[in-house]
């Protein structure tokens, strides 16, 4: 391992020890903000420090084994020990490289998840509902909380558009690769001839940024409309104009929120989504301007950016970014999507490592 990397790891180890001492001090324990910040930093360093300790232990074991090579009775055992250490050291060094990769500061945040029906009419709306259930079940398995902000239901079931907020630890980091076009191939329930139809939905994932990171929005740049919430009917349908639609005139971004019965609450939620969308749009514009030949596994949420196909007749799901196919469609639609998400994260980390190697 390079001396610069070892030096970096030593400084992280020292910081971890320093934080451990600080967390035991009365002045820190009594200051909740400071205690929370130090605890978070301590937890973030935990994995890399443990991994580095293992690396040091393996190198120490290998040095001890090398001292035994001159002893004929111990030579064979020492050689086996050295080979085993070399193999594990290689694995641990790969882990350390990944742990030292630059972190996306947004990864720890909650996120907004938007699902929109695209081409395919009613069937696209039904598929949007299927995707919403898939993500809801996945969130449930992770003990995350899903909060519906706005839902525009389609006539045959499902949604023309649904926007939700997902709350939990590391939510954006796990879901950010879901942005892009999702295509379904299946026989619709309304199809009498048994023909397979292709429909599509778009998914967009954005971090919920803290207030300090949100852009200042000029009130004169906004058009705010209020209207009555739409719903299936019955006693819970609003009779007041509590639903809110906000248009950001300079960018043309439109956000609707109708989940709360209070117009003020709906407006606050819509403003939060709008701010995140403005930040995301600017980020995508900058990334596009800086784009080089390296592929970008982070989808844009654009309809043309097809990332995944769900083929019902064959029971398969294919991720087109890394040519990954799994034949467990039922499990996937029931929320077991880690086997699709984790390979993308691994591939993304490999791309980051390759980029760092090129810069070195």
UniProtKB/Swiss-Prot annotation:
GO terms for cellular component: cytoplasm. Residues 284-295 have a biased composition (Basic and acidic residues). SMART domains: PCRF (SM00937). The modification N5-methylglutamine is found at residue 235. PROSITE patterns: RF_PROK_I (PS00745). InterPro entries: PCRF, Pep_chain_release_fac_I, Pep_chain_release_fac_I_sf, Prokaryotic/Mito_RF, RF-1. Peptide chain release factor 1 directs the termination of translation in response to the peptide chain termination codons UAG and UAA. This is Peptide chain release factor 1. It comes from Pasteurella multocida (strain Pm70).
């Amino acid at each position: 391992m390079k001396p610069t990397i070892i030096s970096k790891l030593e400084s992280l180890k020292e910081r971890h020890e320093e934080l451990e001492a600080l967390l035991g001090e009365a002045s820190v324990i009594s200051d909740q903000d400071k205690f929370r910040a130090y605890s978070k930093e301590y937890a973030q360093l935990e994995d890399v420090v443990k991994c580095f300790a293992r690396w040091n232990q393996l190198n120490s074991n290998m040095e001890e084994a090398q001292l035994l090579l001159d002893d004929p009775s111990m030579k064979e055992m020492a050689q086996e020990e050295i080979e085993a250490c070399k193999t594990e050291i290689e694995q641990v060094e790969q882990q350390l490289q990944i742990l030292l990769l630059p972190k996306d500061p947004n990864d720890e945040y909650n996120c907004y998840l938007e699902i929109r029906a695209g081409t395919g009419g009613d069937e696209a709306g039904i598929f949007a509902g299927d995707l919403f259930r898939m993500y809801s079940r996945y969130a449930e398995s992770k003990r995350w909380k899903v909060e519906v902000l706005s839902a525009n239901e389609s006539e045959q079931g499902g949604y023309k558009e649904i926007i939700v907020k997902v709350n939990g630890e590391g939510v954006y980091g796990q879901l950010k690769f879901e942005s892009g076009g999702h295509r379904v191939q299946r026989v619709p329930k309304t199809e009498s001839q048994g023909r397979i139809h292709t429909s599509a939905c778009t998914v967009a994932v954005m971090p919920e940024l803290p207030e300090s990171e949100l852009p200042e929005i000029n009130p004169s740049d906004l058009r705010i409309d209020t209207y009555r919430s739409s719903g299936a009917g019955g006693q819970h349908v609003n009779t007041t104009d509590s639903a809110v639609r906000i248009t950001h005139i300079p960018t043309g971004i439109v956000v609707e929120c109708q989940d709360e019965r209070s117009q003020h609450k709906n407006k606050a939620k819509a403003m939060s989504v709008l701010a995140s969308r403005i930040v995301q749009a600017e980020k995508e514009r900058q990334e596009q301007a800086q784009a080089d030949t390296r592929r970008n596994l982070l989808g844009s949420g654009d309809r043309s950016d097809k990332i995944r196909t769900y083929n019902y007749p064959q029971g398969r799901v294919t991720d087109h970014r890394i040519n990954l196919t799994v034949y467990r469609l039922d499990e996937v639609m029931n929320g077991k999507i880690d086997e699709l998400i984790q390979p993308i994260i691994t591939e993304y980390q490999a791309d980051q490592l390759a980029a760092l190697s090129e810069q070195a």
